[in-house]
A protein has these predicted regions:
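Short acidic low-complexity segments
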Residues: 18-32, 84-87, 223-239, 245-252
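His/Asp/Glu-rich metal-coordinating catalytic cores
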Residues: 3-33, 37, 43-184, 195-196
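C-terminal regulatory/interaction regions
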Residues: 4-7, 227-350
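Short, well-ordered alpha-helical microsegments
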Residues: 48, 104, 126-127, 186-190, ...
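Active-site regions of enzymes building and remodeling cell-envelope glycoconjugates
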Residues: 36-43, 52-59, 71-80, 90-93, ...
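Binuclear metal-ion centers of metallo-dependent hydrolases, dominated by the metallo-beta-lactamase
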Residues: 134-135, 149-234, 305-350
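Short secondary-structure boundary segments
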Residues: 59, 145, 206, 266, ...
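Alpha-helix capping/helix-boundary segments
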Residues: 45, 61-62, 185, 208, ...
Length: 350
């Protein structure tokens, strides 16, 4: 195997029970248990956990961890800007936009001329609420594979928003509830609704408020937003409201007149999932790369080694192997869907 440098990628990063570890750098990336020094790719709770001795992340990710876990979520914190380089042990690290959510980053770890890029979660399509994915040439690319099967092709999110707005126009007497993850997906859906020309107030479940307000404070224009808890039931007829997916099936929905249940997720490509959740209006909108995006990104990095961290590892590993790339699953346990429990509020607060 030929590398740009003289050090093997596995000498720079390797999987451990705590997550990806750089022994020569003295840190872990997105560790699943408390460690001395953690580099965090983004604020979703399956990647950003409290209790580490020190955390290095973008300012937005640090801020979101504070919102979720409180001021003392780590012993110490340090913010790093996109593109800045920092020496850690015998490595040099830099953070680059991942296009997943606000502040999300790929982490490039370099040593002796060899570069390993840990993608975290990413997508390669436009998103008005975060910086676009930046392609980095590297020797080894560590990719997610959440939607790592050919069946997952997300399509145009604008078309999914158009479905929602047609339903709102068709059923003006019904409230429309859109289930969406509280960090990233909710704000992107709101921005897409605004881009489609919808200028009426959009209503928020209590669990959405703090992170959505943070997005607004960072210059993301989301139009007029109102809290559901401050609104009478009659006013919610014909309205659009955003809530955590778990709230679509609880008594919170009684606040709305004859609600239409929608869910914005890449998993809505699988009709059985929509039926299982009782979703009336599935919306295929994802903050993860689909099959085509994963394959295109892997090929474009120029990496000769592809390590797959979580998702449908086998299919992507097989695709890489057929193209002469050295690929393997890392089988790291602990990553997956965002844990909405990290953002839940009580019924009274919602």
């Amino acid at each position: 195997m030929t590398y740009l440098g003289i050090m093997r990628p596995e000498d720079i990063l390797k999987p451990t029970p705590a997550g990806l570890c750089s022994g020569i750098g003295g840190f872990h990336i997105d560790p699943v248990r408390p460690v001395d020094k953690a580099l965090i790719t983004h604020g979703h709770s399956d990647h950003a956990r409290p209790g580490h001795g020190a955390v290095l992340a973008t300012q937005e990710t640090l801020d979101m961890m504070r919102l979720r876990y409180g001021e003392n979520f780590a012993g110490t914190t340090q913010a790093i800007a996109y593109g800045d380089r920092l020496k850690l042990g015998k490595t040099e690290v830099s953070f680059h936009p991942a296009g997943h959510v606000l502040g999300s980053a790929q982490i490039c770890v370099a040593a002796n001329g060899t570069r390993v890029v840990a993608s975290g979660d990413y997508k390669d399509v436009a998103d008005p609420t975060c910086m676009p994915f930046e392609l980095i040439q590297c020797d080894a690319f560590i990719t997610e594979a959440t939607f790592g099967l050919p069946v997952f092709r997300h399509g145009d999110p604008g078309a999914e928003i158009a479905k929602l707005l047609r339903s709102v126009a068709l059923f003006p007497e019904r409230g429309h509830l859109v289930g969406a993850y509280s960090l990233g997906k909710a704000q992107r859906v709101i921005a897409l609704i605004r881009a489609a020309g919808y200028d009426r107030p959009i209503y928020l479940h209590g669990a959405m408020e703090s992170i959505t307000n943070y997005y607004v404070s960072r210059g993301i224009d989301l139009g007029e937003l109102r809290a559901v808890r401050d609104t009478k039931k009659a006013e919610l007829a014909g309205a659009i409201a955003l809530c955590p997916p778990s709230s679509l099936q609880d008594r919170w929905t009684r606040r709305f007149p004859d609600p239409v249940s929608a869910f914005a997720s890449g998993w809505m490509r699988v009709r059985a999932r929509a039926r299982q959740r009782g979703v009336e209006l599935p919306m295929v909108i994802s903050d993860h790369a689909d099959w085509d995006g994963l394959c295109a990104t892997v090929a474009a990095t120029g990496a000769s080694q592809i390590w797959v961290t979580h998702g449908a590892e086998e299919a992507l590993v097989h695709w890489c192997t057929l193209r002469g790339l050295e690929a393997r699953p890392l089988n790291i346990v602990g990553y997956g869907e965002e844990d909405e429990g990290a953002a839940e509020v009580t019924e009274a607060e919602a």
